[in-house]
Amino acid sequence: MWRYISKHAYSRKFRNSHDSALLGFSQYSSSFGKTRPLQCLCEESTTHPNLGLSQNSIFSRISRKVRHLEGICEESSKNPHLGLSQNSTFSSVKGDFRICGKRGSGSLGRLRSYGSAAEAIVSTSEEDIDEIQELIEEMDKENEALKANLQPKQPKTIGGMGVGKYNFLRRRQIKVETEAWEEAAKEYQELLMDMCEQKLAPNLPYMKSLFLGWFEPLRDAIAAEQKLCDEGKNRGAYAPFFDQLPAEMMAVITMHKLMGLLMTGGGTGSARVVQAASYIGEAIEHEARIHRFLEKTKKSNALSGDLEETPGDMMKERERLRKKVKILMKKQKLRQVRKIVKQQDDEKPWGQDNLVKVGCRLIQILMETAYIQPPNDQLDDGPPDIRPAFVHTLKTVETMKGSRRYGVIQCDPLVRKGLDKTARHMVIPYMPMLVPPQSWLGYDKGGYLFLPSYIMRTHGAKQQREAVKRVPKKQLEPVFQALDTLGNTKWRVNRKVLGIVDRIWASGGRLADLVDREDVPLPEAPDTEDEAEIRKWKWKVKGVKKENCERHSQRCDIELKLAVARKMKDEDGFYYPHNLDFRGRAYPMHPYLNHLGSDLCRGILEFAEGRPLGTSGLRWLKIHLANVYGGGVDKLSYEGRVAFSENHLEDIFDSAERPLEGKRWWLGAEDPFQCLATCINIAEALRSPSPETAISYMPIHQDGSCNGLQHYAALGRDKLGAAAVNLVAGDKPADVYSGIAARVLDIMKRDAAKDPANDPNVMRARLLINQVDRKLVKQTVMTSVYGVTYIGARDQIKKRLKERGVIEDDNELFAAACYAAKTTLTALGEMFEAARSIMSWLGDCAKIIAMENHPVRWTTPLGLPVVQPYRKLGRHLIKTSLQILTLQRETDKVMVKRQRTAFPPNFVHSLDGSHMMMTAIACKESGLSFAGVHDSYWTHACDVDQMNKILREKFVELYDAPILENLLESFQQSFPDLQFPPLPERGDFDLREVLESPYFFN
C-alpha cells in the first residue's frame, strides 16, 4: 500500500512532460515519470516571480514538510530502533528534493529505489505521507491554473463577435427593448415643437400626420386623468394602475397597439373591445415594469451613467429580499416585513380584470380625443367634415347556438384606408435581436433581455404553466439547449431580393404572389326593379367586399413584414429568440418577418455567416432550386432535379441579372422569391473563378415527406405506410399525395360505372373523374394525420373545386365536395391502416382519462411535460368605463370531446418537435448552422449531407425508444383504477432502413 501511495504521489500528473515544460520542468528519465525535482522549482520561483509561486505556495509547503521528514531520517540514522533504513521512502524523498541543489551542474544524481518502502515506513509517519499526498494534489491543481495563465491568450469573443462590438450592440438592444415607446413619444413631441416654432405642419405621410394630430390631445387627457387619480378624486378600480407610466408613453402605446390590432384584424377595420383592452392593458403593464426597473437603475447608476443591469439583476434582488424577509420573520420584526412587502406590491401582476379596465379607459379617452377629416383635396366647398376617428358599436354575430352581441371599436373608413400604409410608422415590439438571446434557464428566464419572455406559450392555461415550472431544470436541459441553438443562428436580410420586392410593391404588387394594392371596384347597382337581378347584384357586392377585406388584410401583413425588413437590412446580422407551444414545437418570438413565414419572408432572409460551397454544396443549390420551383420538378430524383437546373442555366442567369426586365422565368416558380434568391446564389457561384470556393449564405431546406404520416409509420412499424412516405429507400421519392389521388380515382371509376338510378354518387363520380389529382387531395392528406374531420375535408376539397370553376351551381358543388371527401378519407384508411389504429388507440385513451374530468398529460422524449389545455370556459362579467365586458376563464371541467380528438395530432406534434430539437442539438455539436421549421430542417449547402445523416440518426434514436409503451405506462401509473385498451398491433418494419433512405427528408 505504501509503495502505491509513494509512487502515486510522485508520479501523478508529472508524466505529461510536455505540459510540465510550461512551468520550467525539464525532461529526464526515471522510473517515476519525467519531472524536474520540486525543490528546484521552489528556488526558481524566487528568481522568476512571474511564475506566481509565493513563500506560502504548495511547493514551499511541500519543501518544509520534506525538511521535517529529513529530520526524522537523520534521527533514524542515529537511532536504528526507529526502523527507518537508508533506503526508505523518506530517504528517497529527501534525495529527490536535494537533487538539484546546484542548478546548472547538469548532474541530476541517482533517484533511490522505493523497493523497501513497505518494510521501512513506520505507522507513526502515515499522517506525514498523507499530508504530502494532499499537498501534491493541491499542487496539481495549481499547475493546471498556472498553465492556463501561461497559455497565449485568445482574443475574447461573445456570440462570434469581439467584446467591444458585442457590448455596443447589446447597448443598442437594451435601448430597442426599453426605450422604443419613449423614443416614439419623444419624436411626436419634437414634431409638435417644430410645428409650433415654424407655424406650419411638417411634410408628413398621411397616417403619420394622423398619429401626430391625435397624440397631443390624447397625452393631455391621460395626464389630466392621472392627476385625478393622484388626488384621489378618481375612484375607478383602474386608478392605482393608471399613473405608473408617463402620459406621453401611454398615449403612444394606446394609439399604436389599437392600430396594430386593426391591421391584423382580417381587414374589417374593427377590433373587439375585450381583445383591444387586454392588448393595450398588457402592453402598459409590461412597459410599466421596465420603466420602474430603469428608474431604479438610473438612480443606482447615476454616477457611472451605465445601464448594464438586466432582468437577471431583478431576480437577484428579489432573492435577496426574500432571504431578508425570512430572517426578519424569524426575529419577529413584522413591521419591517410589512414595509418591504408594501414596497414590492407594485411588482405583482395586475390581473386580467385590472388590465382590461386600464385598457378600456385608454380606448375611451382615445375615442374622445381622436378626430379625422378628409385631406384638403377631398374637401367640398362646405364646412370641414370633422368626425371621430374611432367609434364604439355593438356587433351581432350568428352562431350555431344562436346570436351573440359584442362590443367593437370601429375605425373611420379614412383611417382604414390608410392602415396598410401605417406599418412603417409603428413601434413593433419583439423585433429580431442584435445580440444572441439570453440562454434559457427556466420558465421565464431567457430570450429577450428586458421584454417579458416565457419558454412556453400557455395562453393562460394554468396547469400547463405550473407543470413546466415544477419540472426539475436538469430534465429540461435538452429543451433549453435546442432553443438556444435555434436562437443563436444568425440571420441577415438579402438586400438584392428585398430591392426587387420593394420595386414590385411600389408598382402596385400583383407579381410573385404579392396582393394587388388596389381594391376591386364595387359592381354598379342594376337599373332594374327585378328582384332576382337585385339579389344577384347584392351577392356580387358581398363577394367583392369580402375580397377587398382579404386584400386589405394581406396588404397590412406585407407592410408589417417589409417594415421589419427595412429596419434590419443594414444590420450585419440578427437573431430570433425561440420559445415553444404547449406541445413542444419551437417558434420564433418575433411574429412578422421570420423563416416560418411565407415565401416572401424566406426569400428575404438568409444566414448572416457564409460558408464555401464545395462540390456537394453546388449540387445541393441546384437541387434546392428545383425544390422551390416546384410544379412536379421537386418530385424528381436528385439527378433529375440537378438536370432541371442545369438545363435552365440561361434562365437562371437572366433571372439573377435582370429579374424584372428579362424573361422573368423565376416568376413561374411555386415559391418565386426563394427561387429568385437561389438563382442569384447559383449565378454568383458559376460566374466566380472557382464555384466550389464561392461563399453561400443561403439556407438549404430538407423537408419531411408528409412528416406526420412518417411518425405514425415509425410508431406502428408499418411497412406499407413507411414505403408510401419515404422511410424506405427508392430510386425517386414516393409521392403519398399522388398515391392517394390514384386510389381516389380508382374508387370513382368503379362508382362511375354503376347505374345512376340506384346511386346518386354515380353522376358526381363522372363529374369529378377529370378533376382528381394530387392537388385536390393534398391538403386533406396532410391534415388527416392531425385529425381532420369529414367536415374539414369537405371544406378543403370544396375550396379546391371552386378555384377550378368547373361546377358553378353551389348546391351541386357542395354535394360533389361531400362525395370527394368521403372517398379521400376511405383511400387514406386503406393505405395507412396502422396509422388509423394508433390514432384510434390514442383517442380512446384520451377519452377514458377525460371522462374522469382530467386533462391528458404526457412527457415528451426530451422531458417536456405537456398538459392539454382544453377546458370548459366560464364567463365572468366585469364593468369598465366603456361597457360591461365578458371575460372568459377556465373552469374545472375538461372538454371531453376536444381532449379526445386533439390528443392524436398533439401527441405526434410533440414527437416531431422532439425530433427537430434532437437534430438541432446534434448539428450544433457538429459545428453546423441550423434552423428548423417543424418538419423542414435548414443548413448551409456544404453541410446538407452531414445534416441529412444526423437527422436520420436522430429519427431512429427517437423511435428506438418504446414510446407507446412508455405512454401507456405513464397513464397506468397516473390512473391505476382505470382500464386502458391494449396497444395496437404493430408491423415488422426495420427502422434502420431510414438511415439508407435518400428521400426520407429531401
From Swiss-Prot:
Family matches, as Gene3D superfamilies: 1.10.287.260, 1.10.287.280, 5' to 3' exonuclease, C-terminal subdomain, DNA-directed RNA polymerase, N-terminal domain
GO molecular function: DNA binding; DNA-directed RNA polymerase activity
Sections of the chain in a coiled coil: none
Reaction(s) catalysed by this chain's protein: RNA(n) + a ribonucleoside 5'-triphosphate = RNA(n+1) + diphosphate
A GO cellular-component term linked to this record: mitochondrial DNA-directed RNA polymerase complex
Top-level class of the enzyme under EC nomenclature: transferase
Catalytic residues (UniProt): D703, K778, D935
Major localization listed first in the record, in broad terms: mitochondrion
Subcellular location: Mitochondrion
EC number(s) reported in the record: 2.7.7.6
GO BP term, pick one: mitochondrial transcription
PROSITE patterns: RNA_POL_PHAGE_1 (PS00900), RNA_POL_PHAGE_2 (PS00489)
InterPro entries: DNA-dir_RNA_pol_helix_hairp_sf, DNA-dir_Rpol_C_phage-type, DNA-dir_Rpol_phage-type, DNA/RNA_pol_sf, RNA_POL_N_sf, RPOL_N
UniProt keyword annotations, A-Z: DNA-directed RNA polymerase, Mitochondrion, Nucleotidyltransferase, Transcription, Transferase, Transit peptide
Transit peptide segment: 1-21
Functional description taken from the UniProt entry: DNA-dependent RNA polymerase catalyzes the transcription of DNA into RNA using the four ribonucleoside triphosphates as substrates.
Family: Belongs to the phage and mitochondrial RNA polymerase family.
The protein's name in its UniProt record: DNA-directed RNA polymerase 1B, mitochondrial
Protein species of origin: Nicotiana tabacum
Gene (UniProt): RPOT1-TOM
